Amino acid sequence: MAAAAVSGALGRAGWRLLQLRCLPVARCRQALVPRAFHASAVGLRSSDEQKQQPPNSFSQQHSETQGAEKPDPESSHSPPRYTDQGGEEEEDYESEEQLQHRILTAALEFVPAHGWTAEAIAEGAQSLGLSSAAASMFGKDGSELILHFVTQCNTRLTRVLEEEQKLVQLGQAEKRKTDQFLRDAVETRLRMLIPYIEHWPRALSILMLPHNIPSSLSLLTSMVDDMWHYAGDQSTDFNWYTRRAMLAAIYNTTELVMMQDSSPDFEDTWRFLENRVNDAMNMGHTAKQVKSTGEALVQGLMGAAVTLKNLTGLNQRR
């Protein structure tokens, strides 16, 4: 998600797009893989770039979790199958969209070695037993692979948030304060970038391209909307928009800090995040203050976009 995309979106025309995209709607979610938000946040703090499964329960707060989920073998390595009336199993029809999804999911394994490139996609296709020529189904700039990854990360985060909500409703977990909830939500989402952090500046520069801004903005607004929804936000006035704009700015500025952070386990990044969330909460007690806070953060984000431009293509982490 590009910082410039957010700052542009919060301008005159972009702000209207954000308003249209972020309308409160009822949510109907699918059944989720059991996992706990707080346990995931704590577990992710203790993990490095090793891929491991998230903890299953709230009590497993110190279990290590994966930075990026491994593709589901059923969905990644074979097309859908069905059993005919004779009892013989045959391959079901696989749409082009389903095939592309499988290829992109498999390609993520090769991003650390090849970056967000056609080479990574070709390797992913070959790992599925397909020809490397399948990479020609996608553009050469890697934008489809990046957007696929961002979509997967947002889906994982939603599952984590929903699972915690269920635990709270069942009385198996204590509802946390809004600032703590938002801080952990942003950290959990950002930790999903760790296995790909060396190539993430390049990914952000690609997401800044004009043809990628609508999709990138849509994914960002959807993510921060989910965070506020599960945090218990029920505002229906102008605060509904400013809170989401404010959180989007916090996410993107923290993302930029993370790309340059060389501290152990990104400790400086999480400290920066905690300070920004605390500042936003302390300054946001009235509608007027919330609006001022959001405007100030957006101005800062516009400056951060310049920083990102300078970082593009360069590895700033030591």
Swiss-Prot record:
Keyword Transit peptide in record: yes
Pathway membership: Cofactor biosynthesis; ubiquinone biosynthesis
Record field: compositional bias (Acidic residues): 86-97
Predominant location: mitochondrion
Assembly and interaction partners: Homodimer. Heterodimer; two heterodimers of COQ7:COQ9 come together on the same side of the lipid pseudo-bilayer and form a curved tetramer with a hydrophobic surface suitable for membrane interaction. These two tetramers assemble into a soluble octamer with a pseudo-bilayer of lipids captured within. Interacts with COQ7; this interaction allows ubiquinone (CoQ) isoprene intermediates presentation to COQ7 and facilitates the COQ7-mediated hydroxylase step.
Effect recorded for residue 190 to E: Impairs interaction with COQ7
Ranges of Polar residues composition bias in the record: 52-66
Motif (SIFI-degron): 16-31
Disease implication from the record: Coenzyme Q10 deficiency, primary, 5: A form of coenzyme Q10 deficiency, an autosomal recessive disorder with variable manifestations consistent with 5 major phenotypes. The phenotypes include an encephalomyopathic form with seizures and ataxia; a multisystem infantile form with encephalopathy, cardiomyopathy and renal failure; a predominantly cerebellar form with ataxia and cerebellar atrophy; Leigh syndrome with growth retardation; and an isolated myopathic form.
Molecular function GO labels: enzyme activator activity; isoprenoid binding; lipid binding; protein homodimerization activity
Full protein name: Ubiquinone biosynthesis protein COQ9, mitochondrial
Post-translational note: In response to mitochondrial stress, the precursor protein is ubiquitinated by the SIFI complex in the cytoplasm before mitochondrial import, leading to its degradation. Within the SIFI complex, UBR4 initiates ubiquitin chain that are further elongated or branched by KCMF1.
Effect of residue 256 to K: Impairs interaction with COQ7
Residues engaged in binding a 1,2-diacylglycero-3-phosphoethanolamine: 244
Organism of provenance: Homo sapiens (Human)
Result of altering residue 290 to S: Decreases membrane association by more than 60%
Location of this chain's protein in the cell: Mitochondrion
UniProt-annotated stretches for the region Disordered: 44-98
Protein function: Membrane-associated protein that warps the membrane surface to access and bind aromatic isoprenes with high specificity, including ubiquinone (CoQ) isoprene intermediates and presents them directly to COQ7, therefore facilitating the COQ7-mediated hydroxylase step. Participates in the biosynthesis of coenzyme Q, also named ubiquinone, an essential lipid-soluble electron transporter for aerobic cellular respiration.
Positions carrying N6-acetyllysine: 175
Domain notes: Structurally similar to the bacterial FadR protein (fatty acid metabolism regulator protein).
